[in-house]
């Protein structure tokens, strides 16, 4: 990664030999092949290779729309990594289906949302306010009676969202490269095709 990062900064061709232990490139020739290999990597191969969970792997893509955009990728990855089951509750917001176990991201600063950290027995040991743009978490509980969604963020902070604030959340299996600026992830998967040709510039990387 470091070697190729320097090459990118220098405006030179990156090395695609796949001999590196932390950087490799897989060529596929249509969208379905790309989606297939992404699912295989994220669900099966990479977690074993680096001893990580699929949720630790972040997909970054240049655009929101299109066959390999954020919206399509989130739908595909949700269905493969967190498929529906009898024990998982769901809630629909517009075109987005949220399901218990989903990876989500806060998309705007909210200085009023309360969070708390509790013991396994339910005793609150810390609490505060504020959830911020770019924070990522996992949906732990959907209460259809209370109409709330509980998300667990970093350091086990639990935030309870009423349904009317769900527009502040997005699925986050895949996000745009722009949205990821300033963030770090253990593992990154990036799909590129010529359908992204408008965005395919050196500064994108």
Where are these regions (language model features)?
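Conserved nucleotide-binding/hydrolysis modules and their immediate coupling elements
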Residues: 75-205
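Conserved helicase motor core of P-loop NTPases
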Residues: 1-129
């Amino acid at each position: 990664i470091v070697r190729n990062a320097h090459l990118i900064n220098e405006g030179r061709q990156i090395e695609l030999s796949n001999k590196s232990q932390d950087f490799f490139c897989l060529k596929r020739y249509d969208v379905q092949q790309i989606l297939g290999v992404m699912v295989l990597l994220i669900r099966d191969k990479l977690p074993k290779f680096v001893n990580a969970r699929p949720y630790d792997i972040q997909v970054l893509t240049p655009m929101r729309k299109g066959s390999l955009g954020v919206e399509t990728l989130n739908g595909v990855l949700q269905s493969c990594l967190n498929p529906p089951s009898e024990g998982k509750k769901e809630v629909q917001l517009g075109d987005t289906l949220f399901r218990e176990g989903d990876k989500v991201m806060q998309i705007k600063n909210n200085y009023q949302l309360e969070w708390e950290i509790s013991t396994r027995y339910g005793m609150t040991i810390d609490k505060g306010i504020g959830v911020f743009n770019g924070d990522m978490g996992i949906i732990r509980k959907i209460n259809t009676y209370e109409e709330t969604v509980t998300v667990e963020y970093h350091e086990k902070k639990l935030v309870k969202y009423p349904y009317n604030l769900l527009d502040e959340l997005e699925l986050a299996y895949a996000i745009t490269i722009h949205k990821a600026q300033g963030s770090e992830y253990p593992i990154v998967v990036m799909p590129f095709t010529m359908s992204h040709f408008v965005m395919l510039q050196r500064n994108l990387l």
